[in-house]
């Protein structure tokens, strides 16, 4: 989104507040409570409060302000961000072996996101609804049912799109951040001593005083920066400057004031540790604050759900996930999409998590491993981009990487302590997604290599057909072709069984480029191979929708006229069997067969009218 128009900058910045900062903006609901709840062997003590506040403040400065907003966001692919984009950028100017390692890192990072995204809606909404414990303690048993009801409504409206409702997100989140600031400032004024925690010396003293326990406590501190990846992932929607402007002018000051306000409250009233966020508010404001918190957490959950849809589309288009139905919910905004399978699978997982963990404090134990793991991978990938793509001095890049890892690795290591108490959940989900993505990519590559290794040369085949033509029938036939130099299987089988050929044959290749968008000038390349054969290569970015009708329109503009309803589309449908393999590769082969059976069929994927498609089967051993 362009920010060149100065009049639109405030609107874009406001929109960024509504979408990008939902997750990190709702962290004050539970972060300080988890830090000082007594689980680490110490309670609400002055040194502990100052230590945690200092750690939270400097994490927000170093990780969010310096690492992500200043450094990582420099790495963009035509304005787009995200872990898979970073993976693609990092592998552009490296050796094949290094690229493979970087791809694995990127896929692990993407898998971590899938693992963590199940927890975010659950912990956010539950922590807001838990404000009922303060307003009406007798309603404690309603927290789980109400959380499920709220999230059920949220997942149900996804198919209708969030365009209209989304217009309310920005003002609601702006109100949320202003309330955070006011509540915090009110408490700080009553006890300004808490501002001493801005001094990083208190963070150092915290480690010296509490020793090993302080290291484990980092697992709770990291809750303050969950959602930081959204800043980079949503860069393509809003642009770098509005996201940075929103952070430094609204979000960061509001978060700092609220965290320090909670700290000031706890110094005077240690018993407020039950729920320091809601106890910041006067009694008359509790119910309005509860409603606002519920709205803010729903918006944070919406941002995460939209992020899952975007990541899934990117993974599908880059060939790491099987094709699935992707529905555009807005004619104006290409980023607003709905993926039914992902939506309801995520909903089911979130409900199971809520019922299983019952309280946001229990969920906090599962939160953080995937976030910090992604942070480590982001540090490695982004510094690789700085060295290989930007050609920065290798010693300077090494210093940056060391500085990042000196923060990331301790945070990740501290979260490993959560493994048995809930951290296994996002790791298990991430492992499942990593297995699915690597299986689809590698087995798909094996299949295509198997199909093409004995394929006939395109040029030789066309020359033979022109010299000794079979029976020609009127009309145009389009054969979907994956490889430019090999005759499509469907063409070979049509000649073998029907022994006829249309008077005009088009070999169509649809290609996804490593970029979010492809300019219309480069959309279609046409090459006449013989008097009756044409090759058409259509290129799309991974954020664009493959559309054969649009390709035909572009072909018509360049002199190759085609009418969709007068053209026959020939496609090959592979029936796969798993050959002799070691047991673990047989399992992977079985998983690939399952994924392919449930994948979206090519006619639906490319938006081709079903009555114009002829599928010819072939059996392939993998």
UniProtKB/Swiss-Prot annotation:
One GO MF term on file is: symporter activity
Membrane-crossing ranges are: 9-29, 49-69, 103-123, 137-157, 165-185, 213-233, 247-267, 276-296, 337-357, 363-383, 396-416, 419-439
Reading the lineage from the top rank, the first entry is Bacteria
| Recorded catalytic activity of this chain's protein | K(+)(in) + H(+)(in) = K(+)(out) + H(+)(out)
Location comes to: Cell inner membrane
Pull one GO CC term from this UniProt entry.
plasma membrane
Major subcellular site = membrane
* Alphabetized UniProt keyword annotations: Cell inner membrane, Cell membrane, Ion transport, Membrane, Potassium, Potassium transport, Symport, Transmembrane, Transmembrane helix, Transport
Q: Which InterPro entries match?
A: K+_transporter (IPR003855), K_trans_C (IPR053952), K_trans_N (IPR053951), Kup (IPR023051)
Q: According to its UniProt entry, what is the function of this protein?
A: Responsible for the low-affinity transport of potassium into the cell. Likely operates as a K(+):H(+) symporter.
- UniProt family annotation: Belongs to the HAK/KUP transporter (TC 2.A.72) family.
Q: Which NCBIfam families does the annotation name? A: kup (TIGR00794), PRK10745.1 (NF008015)
The name of this protein is Low affinity potassium transport system protein Kup
- In its UniProt entry, the species of origin is given as Salmonella typhi
The gene name reads kup
